[in-house]
């Protein structure tokens, strides 16, 4: 009797494993590149992007943006608010970056979107390349969905 119960329990376990729900894949993102032409002389910068429907516009620092200077350069933390041409949609990236004479590196995450970009999600990395003494091209690469 015990052997019959054990076989039945084993068969039930195998059967339940065979009918388990299939794994659901995490949605894949769409590659994105955003280039912000940042000038230290202006609060507003122009940008271009590969984001459909938001190929260009302007970007400003959010209210929580802070730069902390150190002997080796500094750290930027806070939001970058991107407004697409026309002003009807845009998105906000939260950026953590280190910077110095040679440029900057960091990571970013989408924290919000509005208009046609409401619900936007994504993340990636940043490389900043100095183009003059007062300007840098911030290149954001990653994926969005």
Model segments located where?
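C-terminal region of N-terminal signal peptides and the immediate post-cleavage residues
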Residues: 4-7, 15-33
